[in-house]
Curated annotation (Swiss-Prot):
<feature type="coiled-coil region">
    <location>
        <begin position="289"/>
        <end position="353"/>
    </location>
</feature>
<keyword id="KW-0175">Coiled coil</keyword>
<feature type="coiled-coil region">
    <location>
        <begin position="401"/>
        <end position="438"/>
    </location>
</feature>
<protein>
    <recommendedName>
        <fullName>Coiled-coil domain-containing protein 148</fullName>
    </recommendedName>
</protein>
<dbReference type="InterPro" id="IPR039902">
    <property type="entry name" value="CCDC148/CCDC112"/>
</dbReference>
Length: 527
């Protein structure tokens, strides 16, 4: 899971660095392609770029191309050497010597390139250190310098100007002391670092890869730092992280102090210039109005009072800032002491709990072992008793089974007797509903009274037309009623048994009085 998160972070960092690189390269190209290319600096850059491209082409021709040619030659030579193993070994030795020679050349070239890379990195590091030292030296010099705006400004009152400059010196000395305290604090923290300068650079690069809003950022970069520094324990890395946080906090406080000094210096210069301009204006008014000396003195006193008031305000402000910073430092120290005490107490409580836990576990294991042994003995006794009971139950079940078989035989015999009795009753019922009426086809084919009444008033011709074309041989009412199937169904309906299972079984079994002719049987449902 951590490897997947590392891969995602590496991919994002690679995309970000690639974008920054493309942006810088485009800016450099656009800068080089401007009209100011004729200047000496840009000409040197163009010449340096040309030299780099020529060196790269020479490196490809001298190192990379021979290796590629040797590789392709080995790929072609290997199958032929495998297919013809009976040849002399001189070719193989020559090939191995050539490969060793190319390896030595490439190794020497790579060592030379690594040496040049190391020298370039050292030069860049020295240059960056010089630039940082120069910038860090400039800021204290700026603190010690007097503002040229106040020095060059003419003031008719030297005492006022000297007091303002002295106040500025006192003001800058307080900030200088605070800045020196922060520098000493930074040096003290830097001396406690657990990693070397190169390892610290790697540490900072790893931390910069993981953005601050990433979930689980600390676990990820600690895991990656342990991979980069396997010789360092997690405790050393955590300690270095703590000192780095303190170092960054102190640097941020130092930056805030310098920003406050710049802002206060600007405000002081503005107020001092306003005061001096007011003094100049007052002096001009006094020179024009010589009689109004008293007013000038009052104005000077007022201005001095303002300066002293502003000085008191600045002293109060610096005192409050020092108290706030001291309280913050004390609060941080108290928090760290409290955290250490809590950690020690927590560890002691954890050890006590672990001992109690193992003692309870040992006691529980012994009790469980005793209980299991007792339970094993009880189970053995119960199994012996149960085996005796099981044998008795098997014997009892066998007797019950024999008894049930005898009962089933009796029930089967009784059912057979009941079935015979039912057949006898049904046979008696069949005899009761048997056909007893003789067939009368003449009556069946004769005219009815209704037909006679209908055809009595008509002519003979109409009567002839209404006669059937042929005689229909069918059944009369007596024959239909005499059918045993109909009579059996009517009897069942009267008894309310026409929907029972008995009626469904018996109706298909009853046949007509005369069997049907074979030529009248339908073969539709037999196909």
């Amino acid at each position: 899971m951590l490897i997947k998160q590392h891969k995602q972070v590496w991919w994002q960092e690679q995309e970000r660095l690639k974008g920054i690189r493309c942006k810088l390269e485009s800016e450099i190209r656009s800068c080089l392609n401007e009209e100011s290319i004729g200047s000496e600096c840009f000409c040197e850059l163009m010449n340096f770029e040309k030299e780099l491209s020529e060196e790269w082409c020479a490196y490809l021709t001298a190192v990379i191309d021979p290796i590629q040619q040797l590789r392709t030659g080995l790929k072609r030579w290997y199958p032929t050497s495998q297919s013809a193993p009976c040849h002399e070994g001189s070719d193989a030795t020559e090939v191995l010597e050539e490969v060793d020679f190319v390896k030595k050349q490439s190794k020497a070239a790579f060592e030379r390139l690594h040496q040049e890379q190391w020298h370039l990195e050292e030069d860049l590091l020295d240059l960056s250190v010089k630039l940082l030292d120069h910038s860090s030296e400039e800021k204290p010099n700026l603190l010690s310098e007097q503002p040229m705006e106040l020095v060059t400004l003419d003031c008719p009152y030297p005492d006022l100007k000297s007091s303002i400059l002295n106040e500025f010196c006192n003001f800058t000395e307080r900030y200088q002391e605070k800045l020196e305290d922060f520098d000493l604090q930074l040096e003290d923290i830097r001396s406690n670092f657990q990693l070397s300068a190169e390892e610290h650079w790697t540490y900072q690069a790893v931390l910069d890869q993981y953005p601050g809003n990433l979930l689980g950022r600390r676990a990820l970069y600690l895991d990656m730092l342990q991979r980069y520094f396997p010789h360092k324990s997690r405790h050393h890395l955590v300690e270095h992280e703590k000192y780095c946080d303190q170092y960054h906090f102190a640097r941020e406080q130092r930056r805030i102090l310098i920003d406050n000094w710049s802002r206060s210096r600007k405000d002081f210069i503005q107020k001092a210039m306003l005061t001096l301009l007011e003094a100049c204006a007052a002096h001009e008014m006094g020179s024009l109005l010589a009689k109004d000396r008293r007013r000038q003195q009052e104005l000077c006193a007022d201005l001095k009072a303002k300066v002293s008031q502003w000085r008191a305000q600045q002293e109060e402000l610096s005192r409050l800032e020092m108290e706030i910073s001291a309280r913050r430092r004390e609060r941080e120290e108290e928090k760290e002491k409290l955290w250490k005490k809590k950690e020690l107490l927590r560890r002691e409580e954890t050890e006590i709990k672990i001992r109690k836990y193992w003692a309870m576990k040992q006691q529980k294991w012994q009790e469980m072992e005793k209980r299991d042994l007792r339970r094993l003995e009880e189970l053995k006794k119960l199994m012996a008793e149960q085996s005796v009971k099981d044998r008795e139950r098997v014997k009892y079940r066998q007797e019950l089974l024999e008894k049930r078989l005898m009962e089933r035989k009796k029930l089967a015999l009784q059912e057979v007797q009941e079935e015979e009795e039912r057949e006898r009753r049904l046979e008696a019922l069949r005899k009761q509903v048997a056909v007893a009426v003789q067939s009368d086809p003449v009556r069946m084919m004769s005219e009815t009274l209704a037909w006679k009444a209908r055809t009595g008033s008509e002519s003979e011709e109409e009567f002839i037309l209404q006669k059937p074309l042929f005689t229909l041989t069918t059944y009369n009412e007596q024959q239909i009623i005499s059918d045993p199937r109909l009579r059996f169904e009517l009897a069942l309906r009267e008894a309310g048994l026409h929907k029972t299972q008995y009626a469904k079984e018996m109706l298909p079994k009853i046949g007509p009085q005369k069997p049907p002719r074979k030529d009248t049987e339908s073969t539709v449902f037999k196909v």
